[in-house]
Amino acid sequence: MNDPIQEITAGDGTTIPLYWYPATGTGTVLLLLPALGIQAKLYRRLAEQLCDRGHSVAVMEQRGHGNSALRPSYSCQFSLDDLLEFDIPAALDWLELQSPGCKIVLGGHSLGGHLSTIYAGRAPSRLAGVLHLACAFPHYLDYPGKERLLLRFLCTVMPLFKLAPGYYPGGLMGFGSRESIGMMMQWRQWCLSGSFDYDGHTNIAVAGAFTGSVLAIAFEQDNFATQAAIERALSPLSGANVSRVSLGAEEQGEYLGHVNWARSPEGTSACIAQWLAGLSTGSH
């Protein structure tokens, strides 16, 4: 299947690429948000497999990556607020036009899961469900050993990148990719505080507001997903019906860990498809 890239216009005029995989029928539709530093094309196989099982999938390219025309620099800055206020609503608007009457799930991998959680609290009536994939909050105290040290180190040096080179050099740091320093300074606040709030926002992830279904999939061999961090990521969804699943070699073979699962996601797609089918029929 060729990559069917659609371009939509966000509320601030930015062009947002969507990888669109339309299925036949009226199955639940998924809008998937990538992890930090990950291009949307990584999730092509997952989207194709879900499409083959009757569920339309759109994967939203994150600003600054892949087919996005933006590249972070001194003159090109964006933040989590841009994704939440402009990009996600525009993508959902587009999906509602493409799939009228279908239930829509918002989900994401790692950072994409956090954004899904926040948006679900803001607009719970728009969504039938929320999906977390390898989604664990980055609060440094929820991690042991070298992962804790890495997070603390990144928090220490992050402000320096505002001075030079004007963006976060993830390739150099071995974590993430080239990212907007504005967004990463917000991520830094998450790391230090353990709260979803940032930049003066309070109760940004409205606790208990979303009361629908949540599927949280964790993967064995994921060093960036301790149980404490997973539960912190789910904490705003206290009013929801949360299903927790951990996939290992039996479901995923050798494709495990924080990112590698997406390269051959057969077990993951089967798990998600079963859950989406339940949403379509109202069984959960």
Task: Go through each PLM region and give its residues.
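Short alpha-helix in the alpha/beta-hydrolase fold that links the catalytic acid
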Residues: T226-P236
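Conserved alpha/beta-hydrolase
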Residues: A40-L42, A47-S73
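Alpha/beta-hydrolase active-site loop
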Residues: Q77-Q98
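Short beta-strand/loop motif that positions the catalytic acidic residue
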Residues: F210, A216-A218
